[in-house]
Amino acid sequence: MDDQSAGKQYLDRADMALVEVINGVGCIARDSIVNTGTDILFLSESGVRALSRTIQEKSQPMRDISRNVRDTLVDQVSRADKDQIKAVYSDHFAFYLLAIPDEETVWCFDMRAPLENGAARVTRWNGLDHTAWLAFDGAMYMTNIAGIAEYRGFQDNGSKYSMQYYTNYFDFGMQNMVKIVKNIAATVIGSTGQKFVAKIGTDYEDIYTSYNLTVKDAEVSEYNIAEYNIGEYSGAALIDNIRIPAGGSGFVIQVGFESEINGGFLNIQQIDLYVKQGRLN
């Protein structure tokens, strides 16, 4: 290939043309823009958007990946310095991180598969003041006043950290009926002996009934007379199906889980709540 033909591989400004205008959506933070390889993500006035291109239809539908946390996210962004907002995408971890240093908050959007409403699963990391992020060679790096850090393991710089998850309030399709909670069940993947707390709340009251739970202990197997790794490897992944009696009643019910993470991990796969119908309102 000669230089003349090679040069034709690049876009000539004279060949550029406007194909489509997307109204009502614009990027408000330059460093929130990331290319995932199949999509472009960015922060707009209404939250995080994905410019998902459908080649077959020659269209560019806008996907609102922060729909489920829009109000909280937009409120934080409204107070923040937009020039300080940063974002990064990791193909290895399959997440998009949006960091708002002024709020000491990082929003983590799971990009593996969208939810039914098109939004992404999202968690919020609090108390983080990192100012720059880099995904490189399967690793994630970040900077703050203390230096350079790496995202890995299940501790926060050698210390434990708190994990909290709460559902929305739901009425089980019986809006005018009181629901009496009978049992709560959960399928979890976690480290052996990992402790966590299940919580039941009702009718939007800030009062919860707590139930202390523990991931089952792994059985220690011995090969001849030698114990393999002495049976003390706390990072072993276990699947545990937990079901316990629970209480509480109300028109709407909320379920929550809290845990202190300190070297082990906890992954909540499924939640089942068993209720009995009460009186008609």
Give the ranges of each region predicted by the language model.
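Surface-exposed extracellular loop regions of Gram-negative outer-membrane beta-barrel proteins
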Residues: 1-22
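Beta-sheet repeat architectures centered on beta-propellers
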Residues: 24-30, 35-39, 45-281
